[in-house]
């Protein structure tokens, strides 16, 4: 844990056992006698990119694959929303969803949420276990970037849903209650619900393992056993998180900082770091804690990426930025239909969308700077270009403006 510039720092940690929902450990603060506030169950902070796996699961349920490509560019326009990537970094014109996950690319994830539907992503988060009444729980374009502020234990419980291959169980703090004479008054009886199919959960697990292996969560590699996870760092650095799990245990670590007035303040400078990211202190604390928590348990592996439907692609860690997006058909027995992408440049957006959807293609709009979505829109450019061969269900991105040059 940091030792420099820590005045006002709050750290919350919670661990949940997948399949049973048992909260087996939590850290709520250094001294309850000094501060009667549990950082694990009462503290809130914006979740940041730890919410991206819910959008990932929603996309996978709607025929998106880890090989589907989205914008990796900084300041991509999605509708009227300008999406800024962390550090103002661009990752390429088009990147696969797998790369967007491991590198936590905001532009790609907002495009994904817009394509599959904001309510769809919102409902996926609720199914995973994020409470519907969490602060800021509203389906908007920024939702997938973690503008919601759940409790630490909520995030640990939601990630436990992926660890248990899609089984969601409400977190529980009491295993049993027994009288002095030995009578059992209460015994935990978990009631798991299949929130996501095993294939969807296994694919999420595959992608989040890549976050640790080659992405923003590399600090957790030191755990030395299969682990999946996601970093979260928010605007103005007012919270930083790492949420991760093995098949046996799901744990979330959150940092927030209170200013002299009790209001959230930037973590900048904490521990001597210019910016405290989820991949820094939170991931290190996660790793150190999990080493101790799991030391006497045999190593378990995740199930692995499913073969065939719904996500048969096994993308590389460094895919081509110009790869044509592909989306698998719903019916595994149905053949993939290849179509030639038509030239819809200079067409009205409504007409272009009708043509593309008529060919079985999906459409994502990128509103260009200065364009007004309430007025007539025209297609300035498109990706992929015309005459490109694309599979049915592939995404075509249209750059749209009000006035053509």
PLM region spans:
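Solvent-exposed coil/turn segments that connect beta secondary-structure elements
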Residues: 18-20, 28-32, 61-62, 75, ...
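Conserved catalytic neighborhood of penicillin-recognizing serine enzymes
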Residues: 19, 64-121, 168, 180-209
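A penicillin-recognizing enzyme superfamily signal
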Residues: 1-5, 9-17, 26-28, 32-46, ...
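Active-site rim segments in enzyme catalytic domains, especially the processed small/beta chain
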Residues: 38, 42-79
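Ligand-recognition elements built from short beta-strands and adjacent flexible loops
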Residues: 224, 298-405
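Mid-domain, small-residue-enriched loop/turn segments at the edges of structured enzyme/sensor domains
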Residues: 82-85, 117-157, 173
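Solvent-exposed, polar/charged alpha-helical surfaces in well-ordered, non-transmembrane soluble domains
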Residues: 22-25, 35, 53, 57, ...
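Sec-exported extracytoplasmic/periplasmic mature domains
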Residues: 56-64, 75, 102-106, 114-118, ...
């Amino acid at each position: 844990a940091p030792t420099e510039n820590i005045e006002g720092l709050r750290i919350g940690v919670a661990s949940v056992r997948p399949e049973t929902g048992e909260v087996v450990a939590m850290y709520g603060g250094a001294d309850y006698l000094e501060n009667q506030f549990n950082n694990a169950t009462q503290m809130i902070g914006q979740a940041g990119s730890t919410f991206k796996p819910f959008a990932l699961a929603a996309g996978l349920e709607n025929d998106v694959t880890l090989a589907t490509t989205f914008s990796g560019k900084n300041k991509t326009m999605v509708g009227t929303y300008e999406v800024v990537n962390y550090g103002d970094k661009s990752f390429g014109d088009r990147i696969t969803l797998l790369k967007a996950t491991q590198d936590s690319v905001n532009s790609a994830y907002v495009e994904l949420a817009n394509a599959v539907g904001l309510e769809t992503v919102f409902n996926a988060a609720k199914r995973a276990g994020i409470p519907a009444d969490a602060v800021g729980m509203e389906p908007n374009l920024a939702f997938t970037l973690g503008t919601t502020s759940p409790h630490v234990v909520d995030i640990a419980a939601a990630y436990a849903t992926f660890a248990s291959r899609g089984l969601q169980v409400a977190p529980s703090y009491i295993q049993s209650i027994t009288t002095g004479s030995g009578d059992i008054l209460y015994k935990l009886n978990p009631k798991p619900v299949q929130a996501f199919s095993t294939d969807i959960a296994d694919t999420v697990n595959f992608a989040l393992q890549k976050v640790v292996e080659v992405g923003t969560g590399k600090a957790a590699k030191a755990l030395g056993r299969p682990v999946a996870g996601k970093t979260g760092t928010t605007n103005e650095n007012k919270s930083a998180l790492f949420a991760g799990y093995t098949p046996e245990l799901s744990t979330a670590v959150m940092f927030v900082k209170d200013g002299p007035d009790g209001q959230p303040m930037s973590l900048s400078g904490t521990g001597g770091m210019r910016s405290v990211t989820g991949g820094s202190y939170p991931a290190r604390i996660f790793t150190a804690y999990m080493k101790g928590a799991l030391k006497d348990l045999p190593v378990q592996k995740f199930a692995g990426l499913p073969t065939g439907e719904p996500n048969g692609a096994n993308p590389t860690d460094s895919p081509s930025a110009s790869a044509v997006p592909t989306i698998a058909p719903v019916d595994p027995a149905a053949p993939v239909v290849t179509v030639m992408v038509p030239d819809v440049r200079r067409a009205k957006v409504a007409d272009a969308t009708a043509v593309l959807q008529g060919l079985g293609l999906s459409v994502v709009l990128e509103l260009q700077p200065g364009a007004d979505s309430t007025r007539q829109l025209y297609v300035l450019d498109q990706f992929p270009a015309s005459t490109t061969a694309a599979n049915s269900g592939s995404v075509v991105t249209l750059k749209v403006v009000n006035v053509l040059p």
